[in-house]
Curated annotation (Swiss-Prot):
GO terms for molecular function: (3R)-hydroxyacyl-[acyl-carrier-protein] dehydratase activity; trans-2-decenoyl-acyl-carrier-protein isomerase activity. GO terms for cellular component: cytoplasm. This is 3-hydroxydecanoyl-[acyl-carrier-protein] dehydratase. It comes from Baumannia cicadellinicola subsp. Homalodisca coagulata. SUPFAM superfamilies: Thioesterase/thiol ester dehydrase-isomerase (SSF54637). Pfam families: FabA. Belongs to the thioester dehydratase family. FabA subfamily. Pathway: Lipid metabolism; fatty acid biosynthesis. The active site is at 71. One of its GO terms (biological process) is unsaturated fatty acid biosynthetic process. Keywords: Cytoplasm, Fatty acid biosynthesis, Fatty acid metabolism, Isomerase, Lipid biosynthesis, Lipid metabolism, Lyase. It is found in: Cytoplasm. Necessary for the introduction of cis unsaturation into fatty acids. Catalyzes the dehydration of (3R)-3-hydroxydecanoyl-ACP to E-(2)-decenoyl-ACP and then its isomerization to Z-(3)-decenoyl-ACP. Can catalyze the dehydratase reaction for beta-hydroxyacyl-ACPs with saturated chain lengths up to 16:0, being most active on intermediate chain length.
Length: 173
């Protein structure tokens, strides 16, 4: 049985990337530079806009992060796709937290809006995920809406984020 907590540290998230947090066959987060959060500060089975689950995670921004030196030279900004990927990462993490098994794969998103940006001068990015539905069929799939907040201001929103857990992800090829 997986110990469910409301808070997960950076060390816990790194353990997840090695497959050590959610047990054998549990979903994994990406490792190192592609891990887009430093901690999960809240995770609940109820709550959020739809009372079907909620997560909040944070990333401390440092001016020397890898993407600032290459996106773009002379005009550094965090790629928006990394914020979107962070939201997918969190949906997959939640599926492991509720006991799901398999390899996580992003399956789509309804609509994404970028209304701000993350610059090297930013201090903290907060991600909020509001679960709409969890489907238990041949695969376990989470559906959620998300927000990316930079220093207290909502800068990205996404609707209908979808992540599934697959026993054999090669079926997607």
């Amino acid at each position: 049985m997986i110990e469910k907590r409301e808070f997960y540290s950076k060390e816990d998230l790194i353990a997840s990337s090695r497959g050590e947090l959610f047990g054998e066959r549990g979903p994994q987060l990406p490792a190192h530079q592609m891990l887009m959060m430093d901690q999960v500060v809240k995770i609940t089975k109820y709550g959020g806009h739809y009372n079907k689950g909620f997560m909040e995670a944070e990333l401390d921004i440092k001016p020397d992060m890898w993407f600032f030196c290459c996106h773009f030279i002379g005009d550094p900004v965090m790629p928006g796709c990394l914020g979107l990927d962070a939201m997918w990462q969190l949906v997959g993490f939640y599926l492991g937290w509720i006991g799901g098994k398999g390899k996580g794969r992003a399956l789509g998103v309804g609509e994404v809006k970028f209304i701000g940006q993350i610059l090297p001068s930013a201090k903290k990015v907060t991600y909020r995920i509001h679960f709409r539905r969890i489907i238990h069929r041949q695969l376990l799939m989470g559906m959620a809406d998300g927000e990316v907040i930079c220093d207290g201001k909502i800068i990205y929103t996404a609707t209908d984020l979808k992540v599934g857990l697959f026993q054999d992800p090669t079926i997607l090829s």
